């Protein structure tokens, strides 16, 4: 137990203080505010997705483009490890998609389950994608972000 938790009544009370709520689509979601160390770990996962994940997404994005490899085209340029489509790197697009997926996962993990016996620690993007369309995912991420990072007006009081 830390000094603060001892003074304020225990670690459970501190955990309760770190939970905030927001409403979306008529449902009230509870969000656990991460500690600074947890936020740093989340940021690291989001900004540096695993190479395997990027390669998998890259393969999915470029699978249908292989047919254009032998054809001369200004729209498609094939390099040793990338495909450039209309000036845009598919490898960078894959990394961006992996970063978005990681952000969705990490933010969803901050939700407090209705049933205390349940956990979101092992949730995958595929699980989330099966439940929520992309627009809802982005709305959830924005709402969770608003809760865990108060605006200047809220912080100022």
Which residue stretches match the model-derived regions?
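Short acidic-hydrophobic surface loop/beta-edge motif
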Residues: 15-26
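Short, surface-exposed, charged amphipathic helix/loop patches that serve as local interaction elements
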Residues: 27, 32-157
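Extended acidic low-complexity intrinsically disordered regions
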Residues: 1-14
């Amino acid at each position: 137990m830390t000094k603060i938790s001892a003074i304020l009544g225990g670690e459970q009370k501190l955990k309760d203080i770190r939970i905030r709520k927001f409403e979306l689509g008529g449902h009230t979601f509870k969000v656990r505010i991460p500690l600074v160390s947890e936020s740093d770990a989340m940021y690291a996962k989001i900004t540096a997705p695993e190479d395997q994940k990027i390669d998998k997404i890259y393969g999915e994005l470029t699978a249908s483009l292989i047919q254009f490899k032998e054809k001369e085209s200004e729209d498609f340029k094939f390099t040793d490890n990338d495909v450039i489509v209309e000036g845009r790197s598919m490898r960078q697009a894959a990394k961006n998609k992996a970063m978005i997926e990681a952000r969705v996962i990490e933010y969803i993990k901050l939700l407090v389950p209705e049933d205390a016996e349940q956990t979101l620690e092992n949730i995958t993007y595929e699980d989330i994608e099966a439940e929520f369309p992309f627009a809802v995912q982005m709305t959830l991420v924005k709402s969770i972000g608003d809760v865990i990072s108060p605006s200047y007006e809220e912080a100022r009081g």
